[in-house]
Amino acid sequence: RGSNLTIHPLRNIKDLVYLGNMGIG
């Protein structure tokens, strides 16, 4: 997962936003 963070930072950010939206509502 760490290597993916450096290779695909945008994808990782999208994952965080997606999970954040799921948690909010």
From Swiss-Prot:
Any one cellular-component term (Gene Ontology): extracellular region
GO aspect biological process, one term: proteolysis
More info: On the 2D-gel the determined pI of this protein is: 6.1, its MW determined on 1D-gel is: 59 kDa.
Superkingdom: Eukaryota
Tissue expression as described in the entry: Highly expressed in the placenta between day 60 and day 100 of gestation.
Name this protein carries in UniProt: Pregnancy-associated glycoprotein 59g
Organism field: Ovis aries (Sheep)
Primary residence: secreted
Annotated GO MF terms: aspartic-type endopeptidase activity
Keywords (A to Z) from UniProt: Aspartyl protease, Glycoprotein, Hydrolase, Protease, Secreted
Residue positions the entry lists as glycosylated: N4
Cellular compartment(s): Secreted, Extracellular space
Enzyme's top EC category: hydrolase
Similarity annotation: Belongs to the peptidase A1 family.
Keyword Transferase applies: no
EC number: 3.4.23.-
